[in-house]
Amino acid sequence: MYLIPTVIEQTNRGERAYDIYSRLLKDRIVFLGSPIDDQVANSIVSQLLFLAAEDPDKDISLYINSPGGSITAGLAIYDTMQFIKPDVSTICIGMAASMGAFLLAAGAKGKRFALPNSEIMIHQPLGGAQGQATEIEIAAKRILFLRDKLNRILSENTGQPIEVIERDTDRDNFMTAQKAMEYGIIDRVLTRADEK
């Protein structure tokens, strides 16, 4: 069983205990450290909305260490990042793959970072279908539609031509932090927290 660490703070009113994620939220840090599904997306979206309502002019930092996951759940996070007023800075620690890389690139321009040993991976959507031929055809059309949508957005966020994105996402495409910076997924490789 995984235990969530607790942080104890001293205040003028005494001691206060927080789970680590609540304590990070006080500093406007949201942590995405798992595969992306609807439950994870709802948690991330609610944290972003809360922080935007609390102070619409102060940046939010989204730390990403995720292998990716559900496209629709990831797009819910993406749309919220674009919808709220505060800039969302993205920082890759460990791995940002698939939808994780998509969200990394979706951070505010100039505020997308990765740590030196991070790994970033982009690829086309994965999916499967079963059932009658008509159902399989519907599923195939949908995944092609989603692939085109994700490629277009990734092209806008990286500055890469759509043809390059289509070619580079055809198979799993792993990048170092440096390569991701050259590609336009991030703006800078960080070695220390005070460089942000």
From Swiss-Prot:
Gene Ontology terms for molecular function: ATP-dependent peptidase activity; ATPase binding; serine-type endopeptidase activity
Keyword annotations: Cytoplasm, Hydrolase, Protease, Serine protease
Location(s) in or outside the cell: Cytoplasm
A Pfam family that the UniProt record links to this protein: CLP_protease
GO biological process, one term: protein quality control for misfolded or incompletely synthesized proteins
PROSITE patterns named in the record: CLP_PROTEASE_HIS, CLP_PROTEASE_SER
Enzyme class: hydrolase
GO cellular component, as recorded: cytoplasm; endopeptidase Clp complex
The protein's Enzyme Commission number: 3.4.21.92
Main location per the UniProt record: cytoplasm
Annotated catalytic residues: S98, H123
Recorded catalytic activity of this chain's protein: Hydrolysis of proteins to small peptides in the presence of ATP and magnesium. alpha-casein is the usual test substrate. In the absence of ATP, only oligopeptides shorter than five residues are hydrolyzed (such as succinyl-Leu-Tyr-|-NHMec, and Leu-Tyr-Leu-|-Tyr-Trp, in which cleavage of the -Tyr-|-Leu- and -Tyr-|-Trp bonds also occurs)
The family this protein is said to belong to: Belongs to the peptidase S14 family.
Function, in words: Cleaves peptides in various proteins in a process that requires ATP hydrolysis. Has a chymotrypsin-like activity. Plays a major role in the degradation of misfolded proteins. ClpXP is involved in the complete degradation of the Site-2 clipped anti-sigma-W factor RsiW. This results in the release of SigW and the transcription activation of the genes under the control of the sigma-W factor.
Assembly mode: Fourteen ClpP subunits assemble into 2 heptameric rings which stack back to back to give a disk-like structure with a central cavity, resembling the structure of eukaryotic proteasomes.
Protein name as it appears in the record: ATP-dependent Clp protease proteolytic subunit
Taxonomic lineage of the native organism: Bacteria, Bacillati, Bacillota, Bacilli, Bacillales
